[in-house]
């Protein structure tokens, strides 16, 4: 399971305000518009930071995430009377990282000139240098708006399926992540995480199952199993010749 506290660089007992500050700092650091030379890494980090913030900033989601992680670490089913005494499932559905970013900043993109009414460098990063002429005709802004960033395409649409569209056609499109965990009365523990994305028009689903100390990773392409790894060892797949 992803350690969202590590992603944001905060301790597990971090306050809601500390989590907000961590997200603000990292979202600005890894905003794709700010990292055109490291596009792929920036997109990955920006998305991961947004997901961490969505979970840890929500009291209910954070509680479930914390408890699920604790059960995973001890490998048990939880004490009697705890939420893990009976098996349960909780799914995290993530929004477009750009939507999270805009919402955090009041519906605006802080990298656009309109947000500040002037030079974003002066207002946002505390640089009080003169911005005279920054809005002159033909001037190139610090960065384009996020919706125009090539890696994410123009416009972001949330679908009823729970998936989020954030990619350009032919590259990546739908993306989702779900996690379930639980322990039974016999002390059995099972954690399931599933991620789905569209790559070059193909639906790639990766499912990671951890049950009683054994890890199983399945990768499907358009519903067909392409890879199976058990405890770190890739398994030979039987080819259906019919």
Curated annotation (Swiss-Prot):
Gene that encodes the chain: Dnajb3
Keyword annotations: Chaperone
Pfam families recorded: DnaJ
Tissue and organ distribution: Testis specific. Expression is confined to the germline without any contribution of the somatic components.
Protein name: DnaJ homolog subfamily B member 3
Protein function: May operate as a co-chaperone of the male germ cell- and haploid stage-specific Hsp70 proteins.
GO molecular function, one term: unfolded protein binding
GO cellular component, one term: centrosome
PROSITE patterns named among the record's database cross-references: DNAJ_1, DNAJ_2
Organism: Mus musculus
Single Gene Ontology BP annotation: chaperone-mediated protein folding
Disulfide bridge map: none
PANTHER family tied to this protein: DNAJ HOMOLOG SUBFAMILY B MEMBER 2 (PTHR45168), SIMILAR TO DNAJ HOMOLOG SUBFAMILY B MEMBER 6 (HEAT SHOCK PROTEIN J2) (HSJ-2) (MRJ) (MDJ4) (PTHR45168:SF4)
CDD domains xrefs: DnaJ
Chain ranges of the J domain: 1-69
């Amino acid at each position: 399971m992803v350690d969202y506290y590590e992603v944001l660089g905060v301790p597990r007992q971090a306050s809601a305000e500390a989590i907000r500050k961590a997200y603000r700092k990292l979202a600005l650091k890894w905003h794709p518009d700010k990292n055109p030379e490291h596009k792929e890494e920036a997109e990955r980090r920006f998305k991961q930071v947004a997901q961490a913030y969505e979970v840890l900033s929500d009291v209910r989601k954070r509680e479930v995430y914390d408890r699920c992680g604790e059960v995973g670490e001890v490998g048990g089913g939880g004490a009697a009377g705890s939420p893990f005494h009976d098996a349960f499932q909780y799914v995290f559905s993530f929004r477009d990282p750009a939507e999270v970013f805009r919402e955090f900043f009041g519906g605006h993109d802080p990298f656009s000139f309109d947000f500040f009414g002037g030079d974003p460098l002066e207002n946002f990063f505390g640089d009080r240098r003169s911005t005279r002429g920054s809005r002159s005709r033909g001037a190139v802004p610090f960065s384009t708006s996020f919706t125009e960033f090539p890696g994410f395409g123009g416009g972001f649409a949330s679908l009823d399926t729970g998936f989020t569209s954030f990619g350009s056609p032919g590259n990546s499109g739908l993306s989702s992540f779900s996690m379930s965990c639980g322990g039974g009365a016999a002390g059995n523990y099972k954690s399931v995480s599933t991620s789905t994305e569209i790559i070059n028009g193909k639906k790639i689903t990766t499912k990671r199952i951890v049950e009683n100390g054994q890890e199983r990773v399945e990768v499907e392409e358009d519903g067909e199993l392409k890879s199976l790894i058990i405890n770190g060892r890739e398994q030979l797949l039987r080819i259906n010749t019919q």
